[in-house]
Amino acid sequence: MSTEKELDGLLRPSFEIRTIAYCGIMIPFIGLAGPYIGLTTSWILVFIAILILLASYRLKSLIKMKKYQMSLNVIDAFHLNTDQLPWTDKLQWIGRGFAYEDSDAQRVWDAKKENLKPFYRQPAFVERLRKNEVKVSLRKGKHKGLKERAEALLAKQSSKQEFRFGFLPFAIRNIYKPLPPVGGNALYHATGYEREQDVYMPLDDRAGHGIMFGQSRVGKTVFLRSQICQDIARGDGVAGVFDPKMDLELLGIMWAEAKRLGKEDNFYVFLLGEPELSSKYNSISDFSRLTAVAGRISNQMSGSGDGQVFKDFAFNFMVYISAALLDMGEQPTFKSMKANIEDLEGLFNRFGKHLMRKHNPNYIEEYEALNKPKFKQNAKGELVEDKLKMGAMKGRDYSTVITDKITTDFYERNPKLINQYFEGLRSTMKSDQQYTSKLTASLIPLLTKLTSGQLADIISPDFDDIADKRTTFSWDKIIQRRGIFYCGLSAMQDEVTAEAVGNTFFADLVAKAGEINNYGINKGMPGASTKDIIPINLHCDEFQALISSDEVISLLNRSGSAGVRIMAYTQTRADIEAKLGDKAKADVVLGNFNNVFMMRVANKYTAEYLTEMVRTADVMAIDTMGATSDGGAITPKSGFNEDDDANTAGEGFFGTRTQASIKVEAHQPIISDETIMTLPKGQAFAYINRNKLVKLRFPILHDAAGAEVGNAEVIYRELRERIARAT
């Protein structure tokens, strides 16, 4: 028995009951019979004190063992309001739990043994109670006869979580209550339940980014809610969510929290599915390099195979167009880019006129001279109009030929004034129109998706429209104001558009992160320093839907020094690989996450992402051996002395030997794939900074008093009211 206790010994018979019973008998016996057996009062008190201490020690051991055995079946949930979430300026609360050690792996190993399950398995009558509850519920309140009414009363009592009596100031827990519908196996958290405490993660570790894996409906959103609420409350930087599917509940949670903290004026909502409520955002309006505009659009095009040729042409094409627009003082938008691609000839003429008016003082005279009709006699002596030769501009409008003639002649005289972007447009204009159309065939559909209907009003907005009171989203504004944002992309309605818009968000942020890394967030302001950096906390739900381009990879690789902290949420490793189409590329993405959270997952391959990181552990067991032998003697000796050895003398009657030793039953990762795949809902393993393994469980979160989350209609109404107030 003592050896078994040294190996934990929490799954065994209740030996302590005998000790407690013996002490319970001896205490009154000594108290009553002590004087009759010669014990003084002092010795009676000493013996009673010793027995009480012994009984108390054994009772404490018994309570610990029984509590552990009951927790292997179910652990009571814990509840928190959003305003009760604990956090500090340097720590992020990630749940309640404990450091997962070798002893926990040993307890899991033991609890799965069939011969030890009877010590914690619920009694057979509990199953009968559950069957009775089902039978009663099927009657739908119609109980006939005394038996059925008795069954209904029993079902009512057995299904209660706790029992309350009017004369008692406390409730009595129902230890045989129905198990919560969380699935999985409760024993994984029970192994360290007595060590459970609030678990915190240093904010510095968040710069290494984090990823959470978990099946649908196992609690990822609950964890996300607990994290984003802390980021909003802390207010030390940006707090934002990218949500491809647009979860109104999550939007409502963030909106309610912003209102509770008085930060609704700094809350920005971008909703592809609800343009009339959305903030306006032009992802190609803020850039430090001209090529950024073209890159943010062309990167949405496929670059695989022959597609790279079209992508490269589109990039060069849009560099010329964006340069022309900026030179003419026009803001590039998706609308203007599409319009000028479709009317390249018009842009060529406008840009040419703009350049000539700026550099050529004789432009008006030259233009009027070339545009004025001229006549000459043909071979028949007839007067015919003398026009410029079309040359490479064949098929173009005559005004285009004039622009080409004037600019060509001017730049021949003034080669130092040649505009390379205009020359790029000229080269495109001289190309076969059908050839150009083929090269832009994949670009036009993309821009059409981004500029159709009400969608164009929010991603290609008219900033000169003073009647439009919707807020404007920009990374500069959100970072400076330490704002809160929710980006819902409605991918279920239009996945292609959602991907394109999401990628432009990330491309814009990558450029901004590069600027912050070089100049800080206060670039251009008096006293600005490169050390002026604030946290940019991004929570990316359905992460696999946001990584269709290289922008997210760049963000993960290089943005940590700019304050960007990404927490990604996804279901499986295969989702990421399928989206990227390349396992090696997926490994590059996953290699950027220094913090790994693993809830219940659907397959072994995903679970191995964590189990291959953690250390291995030896799980032990007691190896008991016994042997009996006779010494060859027909009759036993009449006596033994201290020199006799019945096992070795050869003349003993018989000999016995019992040996107990500890053996290694298995050498395996401290957590197994099976463990991860059978976690209950709301529980997870976390590997913080790739060196600290903790077992976590998450709360049932409730709205803070006075800041309840409304339904969709309430949220939409309040967002409309906010826009109306701005007018």
Locate each region found by the language model.
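Accessory regions of macromolecular translocation/handling assemblies
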Residues: 1-241, 248-264, 327, 374-377, ...
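P-loop NTPase motor domains
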Residues: 190-195, 203-218, 222-564, 676-680, ...
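Short, solvent-exposed helix-helix connector turns and helix-capping sites enriched
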Residues: 39-42, 343, 603
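Short acidic-hydrophobic sequence patches enriched in Asp/Glu that either
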Residues: 47, 69-74, 246, 551, ...
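A broadly conserved detector of short glycine/acidic/proline-rich loop/turn motifs that flank catalytic sites
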Residues: 205, 491, 602-603, 614, ...
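Short conserved micro-motifs at the rims of enzyme active sites and ligand-binding pockets
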Residues: 280-281, 497-499, 551, 579, ...
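Conserved ATP-driven motor cores of ASCE-family P-loop NTPases powering translocation/secretion/packaging/pilus
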Residues: 556-558, 562-688
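Short, surface-exposed, charged/polar-biased interaction segments
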Residues: 130, 137, 233, 339-343, ...
